[in-house]
Amino acid sequence: MGFLQLLVVAVLASEHRVAGAAEVFGNSSEGLIEFSVGKFRYFELNRPFPEEAILHDISSNVTFLIFQIHSQYQNTTVSFSPTLLSNSSETGTASGLVFILRPEQSTCTWYLGTSGIQPVQNMAILLSYSERDPVPGGCNLEFDLDIDPNIYLEYNFFETTIKFAPANLGYARGVDPPPCDAGTDQDSRWRLQYDVYQYFLPENDLTEEMLLKHLQRMVSVPQVKASALKVVTLTANDKTSVSFSSLPGQGVIYNVIVWDPFLNTSAAYIPAHTYACSFEAGEGSCASLGRVSSKVFFTLFALLGFFICFFGHRFWKTELFFIGFIIMGFFFYILITRLTPIKYDVNLILTAVTGSVGGMFLVAVWWRFGILSICMLCVGLVLGFLISSVTFFTPLGNLKIFHDDGVFWVTFSCIAILIPVVFMGCLRILNILTCGVIGSYSVVLAIDSYWSTSLSYITLNVLKRALNKDFHRAFTNVPFQTNDFIILAVWGMLAVSGITLQIRRERGRPFFPPHPYKLWKQERERRVTNILDPSYHIPPLRERLYGRLTQIKGLFQKEQPAGERTPLLL
């Protein structure tokens, strides 16, 4: 019995020790929060008074500490002193401080607070570093703190930009830090390199618990390297600023690891996160990103695209309207967005009207002139545009050479033009491929207006680049998760089904319909010359319309009274 009791006590003690190494909840005492190195702490901060935080028993081989605190969207403040000063405190959703330790120092204190009305749920952690590790933000000249390990994040509809202060070489306790601008040789901070990492949260999940859970993977060097995607490596000669394509409604965490190649040591900055939207905005908040106008527009567009996917080649004029709508609508949207400040909803309505005009114009060109090569050039360019967009949607689009606008647009145009050139000898196959691929992709765009998917950024990234002159510097990585694979499978299934069905149905049929205007002229001449044709005796359209109007008018006239009649003569 005694052995069993000892076994139970040992198991409980081990479980408590493992849990404590990962997370600690709550406060140890009123107004005082105790931390341990490397342990995550969850707690709430309230507005009235700042709370004091403390760390005991700091190891003698620790040279500096980095404290960081995270919340989802409400700001919190961390400060060296109870009085908040700009050069000794930091405020934000992801903020922190560097504590340079003095000789024999074994205790460290700081203060936490919030200016928000509502209580703020936070997660915080302390990380320790030795004298061989580089100091993140140790050569700060741009921001308020003397040593600033924070990553500053700005976003708009087009791009998200992160900025951070350069690091410095590590140094022992009680020793002056190495000068930041004394030289550019290998004995100075100019040998340091910066690896920028990007981590995507699960799609369509805006919960606070999910964010704080995944932030734990982005605080220390080994976890960042194992979990996140390395986007770019910067040297000390590069500008400490990196831009990414904004993904509204998609949670993204960014972090920077500074590496000393001479000592092979690293340190992590404080990760920053964003959803590229506001949780507190009334209109267009993170919880209601999909506009009604977008849903209506892309739903109608998808219905037409779905029809084109399976029946486009048979209904040739309808397909031409669809292609003309895409071409004219795309260029008009770019033009009106760049030249005018009108609202999105009005812009979308004008785009729909202009696209319809473009579609009818292409149909009219075919009906009157019947030049197949011009129509198929438009069809092939639309397919080439999508294939070129898919090409730059891959990691190829993030190559440094394509950050130059001239190189990008020339390469993009060459790929788009190459498609109709390659298929110019088999126009029917080109037309059916365009119907299947473009028609099915319109369904993907409609799905995105209701349920976010990364596949919409295939064309949206190109549109952003055409609209924004600074988008060329942005990295266009997107998450590719379970729902994206499902929608990709739907896209592929629709495209293959539509192409296969149309190829089988069009066997033995003429490649394309005859010239409509010639048929109309031949029919008109036949009716004029052939008096045996019953249609020859049909009155002209004007007389038929006049007769029909006369009949309708007679329905509203009163019947005249019958007058005196002459009797029959026997």
From Swiss-Prot:
InterPro entries: TM7S3/TM198-like_dom, TM7SF3. Residues 1-21 form the signal peptide. Its main location: membrane. GO terms for cellular component: extracellular exosome; plasma membrane. Involved in the inhibition of cytokine-induced death of pancreatic beta cells. Involved in the promotion of insulin secretion from pancreatic beta cells. Is a downstream transcriptional target of p53/TP53, and acts as a pro-survival homeostatic factor that attenuates the development of cellular stress. Maintains protein homeostasis and promotes cell survival through attenuation of endoplasmic reticulum (ER) stress and the subsequent induction of unfolded protein response (UPR). PANTHER family: TRANSMEMBRANE 7 SUPERFAMILY MEMBER 3. This is Transmembrane 7 superfamily member 3. The lineage of its organism: Eukaryota, Metazoa, Chordata, Craniata, Vertebrata. The gene is TM7SF3.
